[in-house]
């Protein structure tokens, strides 16, 4: 689980990668998995200067339910000061109403992309 949250390098830039389905395992309790990942993620992101983190959240294969979204909501607020940009990939399985709820609660855009390379290019396009 520790390598589900890690910095990668893309075209010479550091990007914080969060893989919800790291290893391709489908969790029996998505909310518990997100809580565990949240600790790792917040530990990583809060060590960085404000406004500096490029974040790629990979939801490929993840199944989010209402409980998982409730766990995710405060994380989207707590990480905000540290982020320069964030992008989500693999969100096809997140119901639109839950995605819109996350955007509304966090008061930020959550750009979605079909593939990682697209998301990474967008993160660096600033």
Give each language-model segment a name.
Residues 1-126:
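Amphipathic, Lys/Arg-enriched alpha-helical "gate/interface" segment within cytosolic domains
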